[in-house]
């Protein structure tokens, strides 16, 4: 019998109301305003705004942001995502690396997180453009660590290796949901291909921190979350984020359930038993508190190395 907090409670197909644990105060202030001004002054899209992230005020009030590279429109139309869809995006901006570097300098970032729209219109999926951005950041901010949340490059392993050759601290690629729901949630992406890309990254650079993330509340079962965590661990992933799916608008996939904080704690214990570093909670997203997660994982690896 399952020991999860939700094992004895009935499932609701449609949540009746917004639970209290998903209500939060907005920490606006001078730091938020400065971050907002710095980003807009450089004309840079962020996933914070384009994807309607609920943590934007929190992160910007901490002088952190996640840059959205290769444009603000995506060649895929995933059912959970609020980023605009287009079949013909603009060419990559050759000055994007310099713009991100200038913004990161102004914000004093020591850990820079970059995500990207899927660019299926480009032969390499945008890997070279992203690698060039990373190279520029290394030149302009040599002390900063860089985390990249990349697309699946349509399974192009050469493109993945080219990106990884640019030297990053964390490679992140999200499976987003359990295998059964993946065809409903993700457009032109597959669960198994995502696992393959994660495994390829782990094999190519064994010391690289490999990260992935999943959303809950989409209709998944507890057993499926457990299997997903096992799959991720078996494919070389070291860090997993787990957060509540929140519907950006009525045209997106509806929320099937609101997962309790106790259940997030339970999933954390399941993942930790598999050797994973789990960051889980209702508002957790792939890049939420990414700097703190990176530091905690770094400390864990240093401790592990000292014991051996």
From Swiss-Prot:
SUPFAM superfamilies assigned: Radical SAM enzymes
Primary location class: cytoplasm
Annotated [4Fe-4S] cluster 2 binding sites: 74, 78, 81
Residues at which [4Fe-4S] cluster 1 binds: 48, 53, 59, 287
Superkingdom of origin: Bacteria
Substrates-to-products reaction catalysed: [[Fe-S] cluster scaffold protein carrying a second [4Fe-4S](2+) cluster] + N(6)-octanoyl-L-lysyl-[protein] + 2 oxidized [2Fe-2S]-[ferredoxin] + 2 S-adenosyl-L-methionine + 4 H(+) = [[Fe-S] cluster scaffold protein] + N(6)-[(R)-dihydrolipoyl]-L-lysyl-[protein] + 4 Fe(3+) + 2 hydrogen sulfide + 2 5'-deoxyadenosine + 2 L-methionine + 2 reduced [2Fe-2S]-[ferredoxin]
Protein EC: 2.8.1.8
Binding note for cofactor: Binds 2 [4Fe-4S] clusters per subunit. One cluster is coordinated with 3 cysteines and an exchangeable S-adenosyl-L-methionine.
An example molecular function term from Gene Ontology annotations: 4 iron, 4 sulfur cluster binding
Transmembrane spans: none
Functional pathway: Protein modification; protein lipoylation via endogenous pathway; protein N(6)-(lipoyl)lysine from octanoyl-[acyl-carrier-protein]: step 2/2
UniProt keyword annotations, A-Z: 4Fe-4S, Cytoplasm, Iron, Iron-sulfur, Metal-binding, S-adenosyl-L-methionine, Transferase
Cofactors, names only: [4Fe-4S] cluster
PROSITE patterns xref list: RADICAL_SAM (PS51918)
Cellular localization per UniProt: Cytoplasm
Membership in a protein family: Belongs to the radical SAM superfamily. Lipoyl synthase family.
Protein name listed in UniProt: Lipoyl synthase
The organism of origin for this protein: Chlamydia muridarum (strain MoPn / Nigg)
